[in-house]
Design a protein with these regions (language model features):
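Periplasmic peptidoglycan-binding/anchoring modules of Gram-negative envelope and division proteins
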Residues: 227-239, 250-284, 308, 312-313, ...
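Surface-exposed edge beta-strand/loop patches
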Residues: 27, 67-69, 155-220, 354, ...
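Periplasmic OmpA-like peptidoglycan-binding domain that tethers envelope proteins to the cell wall
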Residues: 286-364, 370
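The feature marks short-to-medium sequence segments in extracytoplasmic or secretory-pathway proteins
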Residues: 103-158, 268, 272, 412, ...
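Short, low-complexity, disordered segments immediately C-terminal to signal peptides
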Residues: 25-61
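Short, well-ordered beta-strand segments enriched in hydrophobic/aromatic residues
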Residues: 94-102, 416-424
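N-terminal export leaders
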Residues: 3-12
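C-terminal motif of bacterial Sec signal peptides marking the signal peptidase cleavage site
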Residues: 21-23
């Protein structure tokens, strides 16, 4: 049960992609051929209205010096004209106004009839307003959440179609900012004004504010990728790289002798390390909680040594300071409460703290252009269609259906920004889009972290290459878990024909064609240790 979309791109990728949905439940895939970067492309999907995209990015956005950036968007069934900015710095706060005009009401709004943006833009806290808005700096590779929340309630209707909300951030030094608005898209190049002159509405918003539990300072974006064969995954953070190797691929049960399949996985890890000029490498073995502590500790240490020895044979490690250790069952990645989780905990973890950045940031498939080199993509377990055409998914044996259309993918520095339109099928949906678009093997984040704040998040949409699955970029929040740079609260039901806008940011795969995929659930009973 996998759905898949494909999209051709150069500087901008507009949605003429291919989407493949697996039959009865959400997994799927999509891909396609996009226009030349110098052209503009109209995009739209069932029930989504229309939007436009230019080579400069900012789909449907307009704005100039000192002006806000305007987009016409589809948000939980409603068609809205949203103007973001200009942002105004006043003392210790930067106020980002969001002026919204209701063009057409849908029937999916959490406050029908009409539309209440404060119920969609308010983030995961207990506030009403625009607490869920975030700032993205693609050049610096950072994201910033609000640090204060203004409790603003808005009810838009035909009689009163206009309102203004305010997102409150710590001030930034930049002249312009990129503003990610929940289920409304990315607003790029919003001007920042430093004269401290706030509107009367902004002053009123600042009269009743609360400090949030968000991450108010800019925090580095990280990448999380997994090998298509499930043998490894990689986390790239600001100062370290962590490669997790699945012990079930490297070793037989209760053994520290490398298997015949281990070299393929270890060679990929060696190639990753070889892109760095040097640094400190620690190799640590981990087990599940089957068998006693002493046995698991010894096994984990011997496995770490085996991996270290073989890596030294596969690549020149002289530029690295290498250490090995074992933790047994003491530091599980996820709770040892299921066979699937125990499998995740059986691993050898390679942590690199490099002396400087990698010599190449390209993906293993970057030189392949179309993304079809270096092997074939995994077989889709459902239909395949162009991203602009969309794929309709049915959940289980129910009549609950949703159509997903990949409307645009744009390169921004070393990132890809994608927009997906989700539209309710006949009879509408029983759950919001996020419930369809979460990892099917892991609870919480794509990394396997448990976080109740991600129950409504879009965490499972990945870009697929023959070798690697690229999950949405993410960042560490105050609680210590990772939140994706995608929708966090896309949990509103969609009635028939109503659509909403989902924005997802991935690391650049370095290819001319991207494949959007949602992996299927896998049921296995792996061996212990």
């Amino acid at each position: 049960m996998r759905r898949r979309m494909f999209l051709s791109r150069s500087s901008i990728l507009a949605g003429v992609g291919l989407l493949a949905l697996a039959g009865c439940e959400p997994p799927w895939r999509s891909r396609g051929e996009g226009p030349d970067a110098s052209t503009s492309a109209a995009s739209g999907g069932a029930g989504s209205g229309s939007a436009s995209a230019s080579a400069s990015g900012s789909a449907g956005a307009s704005g100039g010096s000192g002006q806000g950036v305007t987009r016409t968007v589809t948000t939980v069934g409603a068609t809205l004209e949203v103007t973001v900015g200009p942002a105004v710095v006043s003392d210790d706060v930067m106020v980002v106004p969001l002026v919204v005009h209701l063009v057409k009401a849908g029937s999916s709004s959490p406050s029908t009839p009409g539309f209440s943006p404060h119920l969609v833009w308010n983030g995961t806290g207990s506030f009403t307003g625009a607490d869920g808005v975030r700032l993205v700096d693609f050049d610096a590779g950072t994201v910033q959440e609000t640090f204060k929340a203004s409790s603003e309630s808005t009810g838009l209707s035909e009689e009163e179609p206009d309102a203004t909300l305010h997102a409150l951030f710590k001030p930034v030094d930049a002249k312009t900012i990129n503003v990610l608005v929940p289920e409304s898209g990315l607003f790029e190049g919003v001007p920042v004004v430093r004269d401290g002159k706030l509107s009367d509405e902004a002053k009123k918003a600042l009269e009743y504010v609360n400090t949030t539990e968000n991450t108010p300072d800019p925090v580095a974006l990280e990448t999380f990728t997994a090998s298509v064969d499930g043998a490894s995954d990689t986390r790239v953070a600001d100062k370290s790289v962590v490669i997790n190797l699945a012990s079930d691929v490297l070793f037989a049960s209760d053994s520290a002798d490398l298997s015949s399949q281990a070299d393929a996985t270890l060679k990929k890890a060696a190639d990753q390390l070889a892109t760095y000029p040097g640094g400190e490498v620690s190799i640590v073995g981990h087990t599940d909680d089957v068998a006693d502590d002493a046995h698991n500790l010894d096994l984990s240490k011997r496995r770490a040594t085996s991996v270290s020895d073989r890596l030294g044979q596969l690549t020149n490690m002289s530029a690295f300071s290498v250490s090995t250790d074992g933790k047994g069952e003491s530091t599980p990645r996820v709770p040892n409460d299921s066979d699937g989780n125990r499998q995740l905990n059986r691993r050898v973890e390679i942590t690199l703290v490099p002396t400087q950045a990698a010599s190449s940031t390209s993906s293993p498939d970057a030189s392949k252009g179309t993304g079809q080199g270096g092997g074939d993509l995994p077989q889709a377990e459902g239909p395949v269609a162009k991203g602009s055409e969309g794929v309709t998914v049915t959940r289980g044996n129910s009549e609950d259906k949703m159509t997903f259309v990949l409307t645009e993918v744009t390169r921004r520095g070393t990132y890809l920004v994608g927009e997906v339109k989700a539209t309710g099928g006949t009879g509408g949906t029983q759950t919001g889009p996020a419930d369809w678009l979460q990892p099917t093997q892991l609870d919480g984040s794509a990394r396997g972290e448990e976080d109740n704040n991600l129950l409504g998040a879009v965490t499972g949409l990945s870009l697929l290459t023959p070798q690697t699955r690229y999950y949405p970029v993410d960042y560490t929040v105050a609680e210590g878990t990772h939140h994706p740079l995608s929708e966090i609260t896309a949990n509103n039901k969609l009635t028939a024909g109503d659509a909403t806008t989902l924005t997802v940011v991935w690391p650049d795969t370095g290819q001319d064609t991207v494949t959007l995929d949602l992996q299927p659930a896998e049921h296995s009973t792996p061996s212990p240790n």
